[in-house]
Amino acid sequence: MKHLTLMDKYPLNARTIAKTQTTLKSTDDVIAFIKAKIDAHPVATYIATFDHYTHTNSLENGEMNPDFIDAKNIIFCFGVQLPKAEMLGIRPRSIGVVETEESFVVSFMDAPNPQAHQFMIEWVEAI
């Protein structure tokens, strides 16, 4: 897992997984794997899967990296506490999955809750 700052301000965790290093064959397989982790978690709640690839390609001026085969986000929330109204601005969580010919790139922003952050790291590392 690599930690980086994207665009000089977004704390991001990313892992590139060669298709030869996993039994998962597609973006949908990776999303289903993560959804199973969310569904098994006592607090996490699945919200939606967003097909970013289809959305961006449907736009008149949409630009997609030609190396991408697919790109989706799985959206979910841990939300055990809501101490401040502003917390909604950093929720829910999202894990992005981009598929290329050779690999999957799985990424997510740092979570404000260290336990939630650790769960996401573990889920991605288990792929």
Identify the role of each PLM range.
Residues 1-42, 51-52:
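Terminal, regulation- and interaction-focused segments at domain boundaries
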Residues 5-10, 64-65, 94-99:
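Short, flexible, solvent-exposed loop/turn segments with mixed acidic/basic and small polar residues
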Residues 22-29, 84-85, 116-118:
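Short, conserved charged micro-motifs
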Residues 22-23, 69, 100-101:
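Short, solvent-exposed coil/turn segments at beta-strand boundaries
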Residues 32-85:
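Ser/Thr-rich, low-complexity intrinsically disordered terminal regions
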Residues 89-93:
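Short, surface-exposed coil-to-beta transition loops
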Residues 94-110:
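Beta-strand/loop substructures that line and gate deep hydrophobic ligand-binding cavities in soluble
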Residues 111-127:
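C-terminal partner/receptor-binding element of secreted or periplasmic proteins
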